[in-house]
Design a protein with these regions (language model features):
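Short, solvent-exposed amphipathic alpha-helices that sit
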Residues: 14-18, 49-69, 85, 89, ...
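Hydrophobic alpha-helical
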Residues: 58, 75-141, 161, 165
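Glycine-rich, charge-decorated loop segments at or immediately adjacent to ligand/cofactor-binding or catalytic sites
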Residues: 1-2, 135-149
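Short beta-strand elements in bilobed, periplasmic/extracellular small-molecule ligand-binding domains
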Residues: 3, 38-41, 59-83
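Hinge/cleft segment of the Venus flytrap/periplasmic-binding protein
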Residues: 36, 42-43, 163-239
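Structural recognition of the beta-strand scaffold that forms the well-ordered cores
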Residues: 1-8, 38-43, 71-72, 103-108, ...
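Hydrophobic alpha-helical segments within soluble ligand-binding/sensing domains
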Residues: 6-37, 84-87, 135-138, 155-175
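Extracytoplasmic "Venus flytrap"
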Residues: 43-53, 107-110
Length: 239
C-alpha cells in the first residue's frame, strides 16, 4: 500500500520452521531416505486470510521440494466455534485413515490446533502435531507428558508492539531510511518480523508461559539485533 508502512510476522518462515522440524527432527530418517513425510494439513484455502496465504507460501516450498506430501487438507466447518468444530472434523478424518498413513499434522493457526489436539486425545491417536502462533493454553498442552503437540512457531510477542512504536517514532522524526525490514536489512515500508521455534522439550519442565518464554526458547527468540533504532533512540532507550 503506497505511503503506508506495514509490518507482519514472517508468515512463510513460521510455516517453514515447523516443516523443517517435522522433516529433520521428527522424521529425519524418512527424509534422509528421500521419502516424503505424509502431512494432514489444517488450512482454510486461499484468500481466507492474508497471513494464512503467506504461510501457505512456506508450506508450498516443502511440497515442491518433495519433502512432504499432503494427505488431505481440512479446516473448521463452523467458524463461530472453530475450536470445537476442528475437534469434530479432525476426529472424523482420522477415522478414515489407517495407523501410519498420517505422519504429522501441520496447523496454520493455534486456535485450530487446540481442536486438533482435543481430537487426538479423544480418539487416542499418537500423531505428532505442530502449529503457528502460541499462547498460554498452547504451552500448557505442549508441556504435558507425551503430548502430541510437539512445536509452535511464533514471533516474540513482547517485541512486536515495541517494534511498531519504534517504527512510528522514526516516521514522526522523518527518518524513513532507518526503518529496515528485519528479514532483509533494507529500508522498506513492508516489514516482516522473524520467527522462532518453540518445542515440547523447551516447555516440558513446567512453569513456562508467554511472559517467561524467553528463558527457554533460545537465542533466536530473544535476539533484538533487528530492532529499528537510531542515535537519539539509543540514547533514550539504551539500544
Amino acid at each position: 500500500m503506497e505511503g503506508v508502512t506495514q509490518f507482519f510476522q514472517q508468515d512463510a518462515q513460521l510455516a517453514e520452521l515447523l516443516l523443517d522440524y517435522i522433516c529433520h527432527t521428527l522424521y529425519a530418517d524418512k527424509t534422509a531416505a528421500g521419502e516424503p513425510v505424509n502431512i494432514l494439513k489444517v488450512w482454510e484455502g486461499p484468500q481466507f486470510l492474508s497471513s494464512f496465504d503467506r504461510r501457505q507460501e512456506g508450506y508450498a516450498r516443502y511440497e515442491e521440494q518433495g519433502l512432504i506430501r499432503t494427505v488431505e487438507t481440512i479446516g473448521p466447518a463452523d467458524h463461530s466455534n472453530a475450536e470445537s468444530s476442528m475437534t469434530e472434523v479432525t476426529a472424523d478424518i482420522l477415522a478414515s485413515y489407517e495407523e501410519g498413513e498420517i505422519d504429522a499434522i501441520w496447523c496454520c493457526y493455534d486456535l485450530y490446533a487446540r481442536g486438533v489436539y482435543a481430537a487426538l486425545k479423544e480418539v487416542n491417536q499418537d500423531i505428532p502435531m505442530v502449529s503457528v502462533d502460541i499462547c498460554n493454553a498452547d504451552i500448557e498442552k505442549m508441556a504435558e507428558e507425551d503430548s502430541p503437540w510437539k512445536a509452535c512457531a511464533t514471533t516474540n510477542w513482547s517485541y512486536n508492539g515495541e517494534f511498531g512504536m519504534r517504527v512510528l517514532a522514526l516516521e514522526l522524526a522523518g527518518e524513513y531510511d532507518q526503518i529496515l525490514d528485519p528479514m532483509t536489512g533494507q529500508a522498506s515500508n513492508w516489514l516482516e518480523l522473524p520467527a522462532s521455534l518453540v518445542t515440547h522439550e523447551m516447555v516440558s519442565a513446567g512453569g513456562i508461559d508467554v511472559s517467561n518464554l524467553d528463558t527457554v526458547a533460545g537465542t533466536a527468540y530473544s535476539d533484538r539485533s533487528w530492532m529499528p533504532t537510531t542515535g537519539w533512540m539509543t540514547e533514550l532507550l539504551g539500544d
